[in-house]
Amino acid sequence: MKRIVTGILAHVDAGKTTLSEALLYTTGNVRKLGRVDHGDAFLDTNTMERQRGITIFTEPAIIATPNLTLTLLDTPGHVDFSAEMERTLAVLDYAILVISGADGIQGHTETLWRLLKRYNVPTFIFINKMDAPAADKTKLLNQLKKRFSDGCIDFTGAHDDNAVLADVMEDIAMQSETAMELYLESGTIQDETIREMIADRVLFPCFFGSALKMDGIDEFVAGFERYVREPEYDSEFGARIYKVSHDAQGNRLTWLKVTGGEFKAKTMLSGTARVGTDLGESKIDDDGMWHEKADQVRVYSGAKFTTVDSVVAGTVCAVTGLTRTFPGAGLGKEPDGVNPVLQPVLTYTLLPGECDIHACLVALRELEDEDPLLHVVWQPHLEEVHLQLMGAVQLEVIQQMMHDRFGLDVSFGPGGILYKETIAHPVEGVGHFEPLRHYAETHVLLEPLPAGVGMRFASVCSEDVLDRNWQRLILQHCREREHLGVLTGSPITDMKITLLVGRAHLKHTEGGDFRQATYRAIRQGLMEAKERGDCRLLEPWYGFRLEVPQDMVGHAMADIQRMSGSFDTPSGDGEYMVLEGEAPVAQMRDYAMDVNAYTHGRGHLSCVFAGYRPCHNADEVIEQSAYDPESDLENTPDSVFCAHGAGYPVKWYKVPEFMHLDYAWHGMGEQ
């Protein structure tokens, strides 16, 4: 029996959850056909999902047929919850991409297609709502071939064991040299060759129907069952985590797919600490790894679960007892995943109202544990909590979750652009912390990294100079928080922080001393870089695809240039023109409404996060932020030295005159 993990993805309102219900009902896995608009869909297990009629959280369902055990992961379709969807892609064997026959390919559908390509997920396509008056099968197929791939081929009839897809066999053969050779030799293509082409993402079977009316569902199930193949797994244990949640009793659930070997309850697990998490000194070993024992292993289908003793490779399960896991992490042989493509570019300020702000912070930390992209930050000097969100609908959901789960009635201020900071050249930072009966000095090298790499950490300090335990502690302090830049107080990124040298006192040094010295060293280095003009402000950019009527392309081009964006040579078919390029989020965030207005609803704009670039109006943003790094006492660049039995502060620019260790990087000595 084949064991397959499949995700179902779609633009919002394409009928994704309705198709999931139809698949469950057709295969006899549910007795009653639920409906999203009736609030009784099998996979919409959350109250908010039933109220809003949209999928917010990825939920599993087990579909069993005589030849297939299918774990179906129903993912969110709304763009604000795309991060939840993207995290799921790393555990999929196949994807089912649902497209509305009435609307065709939408902007978010194109984003999904690009993500499926990036994660190399073989894809079946179900064109839904074919009962709608506007649905045109020929037109939709042409659109799929033009916008996605020539490998998008109608598989109507593929469920029949005797069918050979005769009408499209030549089209299938044209997608692969091997398939063409076989077709020319025998006049047909065997099922195994078709399975291989689908797995290699050169062939994308397309099915048409109406999930609500149960039309085309049997055909799709049979075709899917016929043309998928089970992945091969080895005996070495591995697992990939795609989600963290909490059940109604408050138990923390780590959702994962086993990718090798067997996973048993009560197994001792280990993994790499997540950057930005303070693990506590007793929770991490010298290599920066956590070690915890799994408790229960649960296999879910909808809201119900079965507790099992073990699961085999290819199984999706939820595990209790783990507190240090995070979405995207690998266990066993699996490495941690890559940085997600879809990331929030807006930051919001919590307005606690009459609620205790620290209680709000604790609640938001739990939500951040489930969704690390929230990036909850406490700003002590402002006594504010900031978090990052994808958009207004996610903000409303967070607000409702704060009320429903924690009893906190809060609101949020208007969203602002999430800026980041980096440096242009290497610099050595020095931090010294020596109040009476305390002692620590840290030297770190800050180096720029290529755009999009994020933060990296290392040590080149000799253990003859500083004990390994202290070095481990310093690196932990580098990782455990999101360090802020000195231009606008925005998070730093694309930077490598290397421990060069440090000093401890045999009698007076305590664990917290190196935390202070390390934080101050990083900030002092950033201030040195700012003094030299080496700090850079970064802003998020969108990659966009803009389709407008031909007579309006001039308007669109002028808009993009005005927004400091760029685009490739326009392309089109005569009636419509397409512009593809990049532009700052700050300029393009509300442009979809403008497009809808000047094209009278005929234009389409799709945007996807394209990374951070140098800010196009950095001086203006820095001035508006009015950030003073020397007044930010929670992130001070200054040091504390001791003389005559008392500690005294030393400004960052005077630290080199007082530091106890010489510069360790030759570049500083040459200044």
Q: Where in the sequence are the language-model features?
A:
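P-loop NTPase switch module centered on the Walker A-proximal segment
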Residues: M1-V91, A95-I99, I105, K146-F148, ...
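C-terminal accessory nucleic-acid interaction domains of nucleic acid-metabolism proteins
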Residues: P570-S571, V578-Q671
